[in-house]
Design a protein with these regions (language model features):
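N-terminal glycine-/serine-/threonine-rich phosphate-binding loop
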Residues: 1-35
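CN hydrolase (nitrilase-like) catalytic-core segments centered on the catalytic cysteine
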Residues: 63-81, 152-230
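Residue-level detector of high-confidence beta-strand sites
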Residues: 97, 109-111, 166, 223-225, ...
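Active-site-proximal beta-strand elements of phosphoester/diester hydrolases
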Residues: 1-14, 135, 140-150, 165
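Catalytic metal-binding/acid-base residues of hydrolase active sites
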Residues: 9, 42, 87-88, 150-152, ...
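Active-site catalytic loop in hydrolytic enzyme cores
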Residues: 89-159, 173-182, 236-237
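Conserved hydrophobic/aromatic positions in well-ordered beta-strands
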Residues: 4, 99-101, 213, 232-234
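Cys-nucleophile CN-hydrolase/nitrilase-fold catalytic domain and related Cys-dependent amidase chemistry
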Residues: 24-102, 172-194
C-alpha cells in the first residue's frame, strides 16, 4: 500500500483554493498512491476561525455537506482515497476533525480530543472535542488517527501495534525543527506506535514551513524538504 503525505500550501478561509490543492495532489498522484493524507484543518486553514460562533459556523462544514461530497466524488474519479483535516460542524458544535474517504464512502470521521486547536480561554461550549480514539480499517489494514496535540496530551490513548497517521499544524522555524523539534516529535510519536506518518501543511499567513515525515521507532526515516510543496510516498506492507 502506498500512502502519500501531502505538504501543500493551504489558505485560511479559502476553501475553494484548498479544494483545488487537494484535487491537484490527487491528479499528480494518479498511479502512485492509494491514499493521500493532508494536515490538520487543511480544508479551511488552521487559522480560519475567529472564535465568534456565528461567524465560524459559516466556514465549518458538516460531514454530509456538498464540500465533503465533492471529495467523495473525487475518490471515485481519481481512484485515490483521502484523509483530510477540516473544521466540522455537527448540530450546534464545532470540532477539529479528520475524515477518511474511500471509493465514494465515509470510512471514518475522527474528532480531535485535545483542546489546543482552539483559543480555549475565550471560546464557549460551541467549540468541542471528541472522545473516541478507535481504529479504522483501510485496504485490510488497521490504522489509527491522532490530530496534533492529541499525542502530546494523551499518548497512552493511541498506543497500538498498527500504523498511526498524525496530521498536524506546527509552525516552528526551520532552525527550531533542525535543532531538536523534529527529534522531539519523533520521540513523542514512538510513545504511541512504531510507525507514524506526520503531515504538516504549508502556510504563508502565518508562516508554516510544512513538511511530511515518516517516523519508525522514534527515528525520522523519510521526509520532504521544508517550504517546498511535495508529496512523500511511503510504502506500507
Amino acid at each position: 500500500m502506498r500512502i502519500g503525505l501531502v505538504s501543500y500550501q493551504c489558505k485560511n478561509r479559502n476553501i475553494a483554493f484548498n479544494m483545488k490543492q487537494i484535487e491537484l495532489a490527487m491528479q499528480r498522484s494518479a498511479g502512485k498512491a492509494d491514499l493521500l493524507c493532508f494536515g490538520e484543518a487543511f480544508l479551511q486553514g488552521f487559522d480560519a476561525l475567529c472564535w465568534d460562533y456565528e461567524a465560524d459556523k459559516t466556514i465549518a462544514r458538516e460531514l454530509l455537506s456538498d464540500t465533503i461530497s465533492q471529495l467523495r466524488i473525487w475518490t471515485i474519479q481519481y481512484g485515490i482515497s483521502l484523509i483530510v483535516g477540516y473544521i466540522e460542524k455537527f448540530e450546534e458544535k464545532l470540532y477539529s476533525s479528520c475524515v477518511v474517504l474511500s471509493n465514494g464512502e465515509i470510512l471514518y470521521n475522527y474528532r480531535r480530543i485535545s483542546k489546543g486547536w482552539k483559543e480555549f480561554s475565550i471560546t464557549d461550549s460551541h467549540y468541542c472535542e471528541g472522545n473516541q480514539t478507535s481504529a479504522f480499517r483501510f485496504h485490510g489494514k488497521e490504522m489509527t488517527l491522532a490530530l496534533c496535540g492529541d499525542l502530546w496530551e494523551f499518548p497512552d490513548r493511541f498506543k497500538a501495534d498498527q500504523l498511526l497517521i498524525w496530521p498536524v499544524y506546527v509552525n516552528y522555524t526551520v532552525e527550531e525543527w533542525d535543532q531538536g523539534a523534529l527529534d522531539d516529535y519523533a520521540a513523542q510519536a514512538a510513545l504511541a506506535a512504531d510507525d507514524v506518518l506526520m503531515i504538516n501543511p504549508i502556510d504563508r499567513e502565518p508562516v508554516n514551513h510544512g513538511g511530511s515525515f515518516y517516523f519508525h521507532k522514534g527515528q525520522p526515516v523519510a521526509k520532504i524538504p521544508f517550504d517546498k510543496e511535495g508529496i512523500l510516498i511511503v510504502e506500507i506492507s
